[in-house]
Amino acid sequence: MKQQIVNFPITFPITLSGQWQSPSAVSFSSLSTPLKDWLLDEGSLTARLKKHCDNFQVKVIGEQQQPCSAAESCDLIKVGEPVLVREVILYCDDVPQVFARSLLPIASLTGEEQILANLGEQPLGQVLFNNPSLQRLRLELSPFVNDSSVVALAAKLTAQHASNSPLVKASVIPKQELWGRRSIFMLENKPLMVAEVFLPDAFAYQ
């Protein structure tokens, strides 16, 4: 079942078709020191963002159950496996900071982890990093360029934030290369995937 929650016109799902690679394969010489630091930070992104603002918000774009695609599959989450997809935007003081997409295998949503299927506007990271069993097994990075759906989303959000004008005017906002990261976590020995893309006004680019 598809559930779209965010209260402005964004088509769900956004999806993320990135060129994911391990940090060791990324040429960091072209990236700023702050961006590299945010990309490689092993702590809670939610907690770090909260330290930079007075008002932290999660706005849910949508949620739906679907088969895992080949592009997002891994050793622990197989192609075709039923997953709950959740897409959100993280805001700091009304500035869109991060687009996040999580894949939660339905098989992982058992026991205490059932709470992950009913987060609402509660940040996923807050739940994950409060659990001492959490392990990050893999971290991958990817740039996102002009033909990416997340860059198109960023242009709309930037237009809305900059002038509160109708989103149809978003085409006048210059697009930029964005960077994101994707992590495979184990929570109570149950796998899940979280991808986070830093939006144009993110602290990571400052």
From Swiss-Prot:
Localization in the cell: Cytoplasm
Keyword Kinase applies: no
Organism phylogeny: Bacteria, Pseudomonadati, Pseudomonadota, Gammaproteobacteria, Alteromonadales
Gene Ontology biological process: pyruvate biosynthetic process; ubiquinone biosynthetic process
Keywords tagged on the record: Cytoplasm, Lyase, Pyruvate, Ubiquinone biosynthesis
GO cellular component: cytosol
Residues reported in the UniProt entry to bind substrate: R86, L124, E196
Database matches in Gene3D superfamilies: Chorismate lyase-like
EC number: 4.1.3.40
Entry's transmembrane regions: none
Main location class: cytoplasm
Family: Belongs to the UbiC family.
GO MF term list: chorismate lyase activity
Name of the protein this chain belongs to: Probable chorismate pyruvate-lyase
